């Protein structure tokens, strides 16, 4: 979450008159992340997060906000969008689409262990089960179609080794389509900083603005590639005990099919490719912003290389 669009206290106070959330008490910009402008907002009635959507297509926003509202109604600890006085989740502020959601308690964990990975697996299974009844549809906006478009834009900017790795992985992924795998709404960005913990339990899952409909297994692959590394700085191979905790806790609520087990190595590579591409895009084609936080693309290049080299032995029972 970065700050690209400035919002003053007076502007926000006026905007909040369209909501039944009390009057503004405090406004704090949030610098973490890279996609949207975010502020922590405190009013006389509660704590919220204000998001101004900087580049997400307006047609996609109702899917994200509706999914959050749906999951919150089903007991998933995620931000609940606040409707304005016209009963709309989406509004406009300083020329940008904007939404106000509840701010959850808790904090992210930098070094998750077996317990935290099991907590994540169970929560992800609950999310996927609750998502079955969500009626709206949006194809994963960072799926294969986006990979190919991003690769075309980035290819001239990459060195020969990076181009070769990218071309080979796109070729490999094109060999695999999984129409028979369980599908539904996925978070698709559930990194450690998008999960909050309090007293040893997951207290919240945030930042649903890359959500879409995809293979449910993709969500687990994204999580494994971030939560289950031996060491995020020095050894980005998968830690088998943490992977086992993630998968077993998930499977206790939604058992895996044989097809999902077979697809796991491909999904791990797909998840690594997706985030390598997005980090390359933000590195080589950055946007101007007041507070902008970008990630090093070398991290997921390394993850992708390791997953491709270890594809035969990545499922952990």
Regions found by a protein language model. Give the residues of each.
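Active-site acidic catalytic loop and adjacent metal/ATP-binding pocket
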Residues: 31-44, 49-50, 81-82, 173-218
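ATP/Mg2+ or Mg2+-diphosphate-binding catalytic cores
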Residues: 141, 152-153, 275-317
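ATP-binding pocket architecture of kinase catalytic cores
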Residues: 42-135
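Conserved NTP-binding catalytic cores of kinases and kinase-like/nucleotidyltransferase enzymes
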Residues: 1-85, 198-201, 314-317
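Active-site activation/catalytic loop segments of kinase-like enzymes and analogous catalytic loops
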Residues: 217-255, 269-287
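A cross-family kinase active-site recognition segment
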Residues: 110-163, 181-183, 291-294
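An alpha-helical support segment within catalytic cores of ATP-dependent transferases
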Residues: 7-18, 135-136, 147-188, 198, ...
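All-alpha amphipathic helical-bundle segments outside canonical DNA-binding/catalytic cores
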Residues: 258-268
